[in-house]
Amino acid sequence: MARRGKKPVVRTLEDLTLDSGYGGAADSVRSSNLSLCCSDSHPASPYGGSCWPPLADSMHSRHNSFDTVNTALVEDSEGLDCAGQHCSRLLPDLDEVPWTLQELEALLLRSRDPRAGPAVPGGLPKDALAKLSTLVSRALVRIAKEAQRLSLRFAKCTKYEIQSAMEIVLSWGLAAHCTAAALAALSLYNMSSAGGDRLGRGKSARCGLTFSVGRVYRWMVDSRVALRIHEHAAIYLTACMESLFRDIYSRVVASGVPRSCSGPGSGSGSGPGPSSGPGAAPAADKEREAPGGGAASGGACSAASSASGGSSCCAPPAAAAAAVPPAAAANHHHHHHHALHEAPKFTVETLEHTVNNDSEIWGLLQPYQHLICGKNASGVLCLPDSLNLHRDPQRSNKPGELPMFSQSELRTIEQSLLATRVGSIAELSDLVSRAMHHLQPLNAKHHGNGTPLHHKQGALYWEPEALYTLCYFMHCPQMEWENPNVEPSKVNLQVERPFLVLPPLMEWIRVAVAHAGHRRSFSMDSDDVRQAARLLLPGVDCEPRQLRADDCFCASRKLDAVAIEAKFKQDLGFRMLNCGRTDLVKQAVSLLGPDGINTMSEQGMTPLMYACVRGDEAMVQMLLDAGADLNVEVVSTPHKYPSVHPETRHWTALTFAVLHGHIPVVQLLLDAGAKVEGSVEHGEENYSETPLQLAAAVGNFELVSLLLERGADPLIGTMYRNGISTTPQGDMNSFSQAAAHGHRNVFRKLLAQPEKEKSDILSLEEILAEGTDLAETAPPPLCASRNSKAKLRALREAMYHSAEHGYVDVTIDIRSIGVPWTLHTWLESLRIAFQQHRRPLIQCLLKEFKTIQEEEYTEELVTQGLPLMFEILKASKNEVISQQLCVIFTHCYGPYPIPKLTEIKRKQTSRLDPHFLNNKEMSDVTFLVEGRPFYAHKVLLFTASPRFKALLSSKPTNDGTCIEIGYVKYSIFQLVMQYLYYGGPESLLIKNNEIMELLSAAKFFQLEALQRHCEIICAKSINTDNCVDIYNHAKFLGVTELSAYCEGYFLKNMMVLIENEAFKQLLYDKNGEGTGQDVLQDLQRTLAIRIQSIHLSSSKGSVV
């Protein structure tokens, strides 16, 4: 093998010695990364490299790993298809995602840029929406998987785990956008918590989101992201998904790529062409914007030439870099100048083109288990916009100052970030040092843009073991052969990872920093690098990080030698206690410091807490015997213990034992005198979750029973640190935790717990809430005492969460004990029952609608409730359900009368004496109706209506000419003429069997006053027998006022009409190509208008 690969290796080494423009040569003419874009003028080498053009003499020199940014070694060609690298699919495409295409379309249309032109009349293409949904669902799975691993430390998923997962999976820019969106949504949610209608509005509405937060929460529970899901985590994940959708959609719309263009990997299977990559035109734009011409855009993009046209499983084969002069890129930009001004369209083609050419989102949306970062579908390495200094050439401290870096320094820094291989640990240390030095001031000037190093206490640094671990994954033995003192090995015992699967250094840094930041550490250790390798490299895996005492150990250089020595001794003491040997307790305590056995680590935890996390019952007993404090709390002082996780503040050893479900340890702590409520003191506010809340959330029946036996209070909730809470006892009590996670048996256990009597001291809020109920002798159920009132509030909150998350059985259980419905909880329960096709439950819920107070009717009834109920009516073949829906519709229509039709006052026009009606002697025009002449006068008819004027104008004025009128009976035509000659309908004698024909004639001759008169007669004569005929006739003629009146009659008398066969045929008959559906839509619209006028308007019924 060595002999076979010797010549290609020599060729590759020759390529490695060529200066690609980043070796610091000031006279390099190919100093731009854009010059590395692949070009058809340089055919691919059979050795997997590129045929380089003639080079300047100054470029023939040896250089370090800066040249490995986009240089492919010969072994790459053997593994370009990731053979043996386990490029398996991430997961099958999700069958069910926590959003619908309708919600996705509404989200994208709401966030549409007005500059993109008018919206498409028919909405966004369904195939493009489905494609986008499938792609982003992969990002959802990636973020959920990382959040799942992070949540193992505390057996709980909070907003911090979701935010860290976003920073791990997403690029710096995307993570910043998602974090900002999540913070905005959570702020709106917290502000809405202070309102009295918080349980009457959905979580999405309270957050200002389009996707259902409750559905995302249920998806997280069903996907086992964690044993416990905090509601803020679901809000963060929902906002993150919406932000991703908006970001990708805006990039597609802003791309301006014509539909005929297709990038690599867009389905055609062709290899990348000259215009592939993140866009030659945008790159050329960067050249022009930056000072120094092409040199200024160095590091913006690094392209790779294609050795073959096919696509590999990771990316199209990209070999060594090929040079393209800046002029060629400018010509390419000019070539696409007109394309950039074409109206962008959101189609499958433009979506694929944008994704394939965007290095920030292409790898994220691929189906492979590992995450491809920093490259697009062509294998082009690119820096994200947040790290590209050339986008802001004046990035200095003050205007007028010199730039922070020279152009050569910028190229060196950016190439440090893009390096994929190193030859030695010294070289890697230099690269990491350059990269971290670059990221530090960038983050300081643009704080909050998602870049790393966000700790205010100091800069992050790399531990030596972390650098050695990173060097193991990035090391390239062949690069050592440049040293003339090193002889290449004759036998290759190592399998080289192909270039295509190697991430750039900036991605190693990004992921490692995100892991270190999640545990609030100031240094990256080797485990952070292994976690990054697991994510970024195919076929690499490692266990999730466990909660350890040395997670955040930091030997900061700011501390003196004495302080560092004390820290090392303390760390040794914790290690001795964590090893599990009970015979080392006395020796370990002597090393911990002045606080002894109760010494806290950097994470604010004592040795007893760590033993409870491990479930080491023997060590717990030994620590208790040694005098460990049972009820000491995790501190909440970040300036002294900056590595404390925010969610663990005020937790006790019992809390940690409950978190990880160690029942024997819980029993031991309780027997030893641990407080069953954790850190909660009687009468004080609770800012952390109690052990019972945590046990109820996970559904541990045995643990819940044990805590209840020891006196735990299920009514205690959690106060948010911003002071916003709806009840004195906080939110998300144990009832709500069990209901939110769907633990029905635990909820019933909590419900069966007898109430504890409180003291007779009343708070001011309780006094005001009591009101006149103090004097009542027979209060309703659940209101017999102040405890019962608190329980009722807790159960109402639990009912809200169970309905939001789709646990309808728990919701019904809560309703069965007398907790009243809100409109929102009822609608959510009905929606879930309909989706699950549970007919008996639908009937039960529909029967309960009348228990909802009309004062609680909100806009949700119109926007969400009516569409749902009419959909059930359309889909249901059950007569009982249909009758119940009719009862609801009639109830919502209200007792007020149907809006009356009013006569139209006819404008005063010329009129003739009735004596001239059908008088042959005085007439000047003759109509022929049913073969019989009818004599009239033009002077009257010309001004009667536009229709008569058109009839008279279309006929010659010769004597004896008759105007034939078809489809109108003679008697009906006579009534029309009588109306005209008499000047009104007062003298008309209309028979019942003539009214419909007269209405048709009035509509045909455009006589609005006569038409309205006929409509009024029809409205007065409407009954259950003829209402369907009148409605059909009115719809056929297009008489909207009479149609609306009939729809009001239907809704007001629907309970009776549902037994009418003609009415049922009108609703359900599909022979008319969707006629039934149109009727239901019209009824829904009419009922919505009615509800608005009598329930939701300020007049409350005065306007009907």
UniProtKB/Swiss-Prot annotation:
* Intracellular or extracellular location(s): Membrane
InterPro entries from the UniProt entry: Ankyrin-BTB/POZ_domain, Ankyrin_rpt, Ankyrin_rpt-contain_sf, BTB/POZ_dom, BTBD11_BACK, Histone-fold, SKP1/BTB/POZ_sf
Gene3D superfamilies, A to Z: Ankyrin repeat-containing domain, Histone, subunit A, Potassium Channel Kv1.1, Chain A
One of its GO biological process terms is: synaptic transmission, glutamatergic
Q: Where is this region: Disordered?
A: 260-301
Q: Which residues form the BTB domain?
A: 923-989
- Compositional bias per record (Gly residues), positions renumbered to this chain: 264-276
In the induction comment, the record states: By all-trans retinoic acid (ATRA).
Main subcellular localisation: membrane
The answer to whether keyword Amino-acid biosynthesis applies is: no
Q: One short Pfam family name for this protein? A: Ank_2
The protein here is known as: Ankyrin repeat- and BTB/POZ domain-containing protein 3
Native source organism of the sequence: Homo sapiens
Q: Which gene encodes it?
A: ABTB3
